[in-house]
């Protein structure tokens, strides 16, 4: 068998595996894609508030030691959000791009877990991602949750 035939067979096998996985999960993939589109679009028009900027400034200006040991006492919530924002903030990524991209990644992961890893009834899995809290409060606003 030539290497071209083996490569074509490998590609066909991969495509069959993807098609086999996608068939029962088609609705969940559509819901996830729609969620990312809706939240991404609304994020473009959302103006961050002072508390969203506060987290970015803490991530940008504090040392790791201060971020983990000192700031939680004053801010009242755990430092995980600042730690996730620290890499783009300290690398000089623009404020809104860095903040919103990290938040969109977290929100997408949340909906992926909801769609593919929970045993909720199908109607809940379709409707729940577009509820006020999951779509706007947790998806669009970039605030640490207490």
Predicted regions and their residues:
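Short, intrinsically disordered terminal tails adjacent to the first/last structured region
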Residues: 1-25
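Coil-to-alpha-helix initiation sites in intrinsically disordered, low-complexity, charged segments
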Residues: 10-17, 63, 78-82
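Transmembrane signal-anchor helices characteristic of membrane glycosylation enzymes that use polyprenol
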Residues: 24-52
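Aromatic- and kink-enriched transmembrane "portal" helix at the membrane-lumen/periplasm boundary
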Residues: 39-45, 82, 96, 107-113, ...
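Short hydrophobic/aromatic helix or loop-helix immediately within or flanking a transmembrane segment
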Residues: 56-59, 67, 71-101, 105
């Amino acid at each position: 068998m030539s290497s071209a035939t083996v490569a074509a067979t490998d590609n066909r096998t991969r495509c069959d595996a993807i098609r086999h996985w996608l068939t029962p999960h088609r609705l969940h993939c559509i819901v996830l894609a729609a969620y990312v589109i809706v939240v991404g679009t609304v994020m473009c028009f959302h103006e961050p508030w002072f508390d969203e900027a506060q987290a970015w400034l803490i991530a940008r200006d504090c040392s790791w030691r201060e971020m983990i040991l000192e700031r939680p006492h004053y801010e009242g919530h755990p430092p995980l959000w600042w730690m996730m924002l620290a890499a783009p903030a300290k690398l000089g990524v623009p404020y809104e791009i860095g903040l919103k991209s990290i938040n969109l990644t977290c929100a997408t992961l949340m909906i992926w877990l909801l769609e593919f890893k929970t045993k909720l009834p199908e109607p809940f899995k379709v409707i729940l991602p577009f509820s006020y809290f999951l779509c706007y409060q947790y998806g669009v606003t970039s605030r640490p949750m207490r």
